[in-house]
Regions:
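Short functional linear segments
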Residues: 1-67, 74-76, 80-84, 91, ...
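ATP-dependent carboxylate-amine ligase catalytic core
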Residues: 38, 55-58, 86-178
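Short active-site-proximal "capping" loops at secondary-structure junctions
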Residues: 69-71, 95-96
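Conserved beta-strand/loop subsegment of P-loop NTPase cores
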Residues: 181-184
Length: 184
């Protein structure tokens, strides 16, 4: 499998933030050139690809936050409130200055070493799902980020996780995460 620039997506150890971020977007960029940008989400977004993977990794109580404005602010407020008594994982998007800001446990963002190591760890799962996809179908960046977040939060033994949905919950991979609560 190749990315948009023709570079192989086969397994290798991810050692830099740039490599990790490139992997998050590789499937999307490959498929984007074969999609109609104006097409409805139902035709070009495929959260079903990560459903089994994300549900399998959803072992901690979660809340998902969706809506058109203020999702990140609400997710951050919920996380801060819960941190008074719990260890809390938080995934938001977009970031301000550093891609790793998207993944936090108790307001501490994932380290560069953990980010690269865990991206290397989940890469085979993602490549396995992507291996037989048609050119116009991709694993969404949100699905890959959710996989990384769940893996990281489990490793850090978080008591509760807060996830900000991306663009539209119905076709958003974050909605595949088993959650006890949803906030709109």
């Amino acid at each position: 499998m190749n990315n948009a620039s023709g570079t192989s997506l086969e397994f290798h150890k991810i050692t830099t933030l740039k490599e990790a971020e490139d992997f998050v977007y590789a499937s999307y960029l490959r498929a984007a050139t074969h999609q109609d940008y104006a097409a409805k989400d139902a035709g070009k977004r495929h959260p079903e690809l990560t459903r089994s993977l994300l549900r399998q990794k959803s072992i901690t109580s979660c809340v998902v936050v969706t809506g058109s404005k203020g999702k990140g602010s609400v997710a951050n407020m919920i996380s801060r409130i819960l941190q008074t008594n719990l260890s809390v994982g938080l995934m938001t998007s977009p970031h301000i200055t550093d891609f790793r800001e998207r993944f936090r446990v108790n307001d501490t963002m994932i380290s560069e070493a953990d980010f690269c190591r865990l991206m290397t760890q989940i890469r085979p799962e993602i490549l396995d799902i992507a291996s037989d996809l048609p050119e116009s179908v991709c694993i969404s960046p949100m699905g890959i980020q959710a996989d990384l977040a769940l893996t990281y939060f489990t490793e850090k033994h978080s008591d509760f996780n807060v996830f900000e949905c991306g663009k539209g919950a119905k076709y958003d991979d974050v909605n595949n995460i088993r959650h006890d609560y949803a906030v709109i």
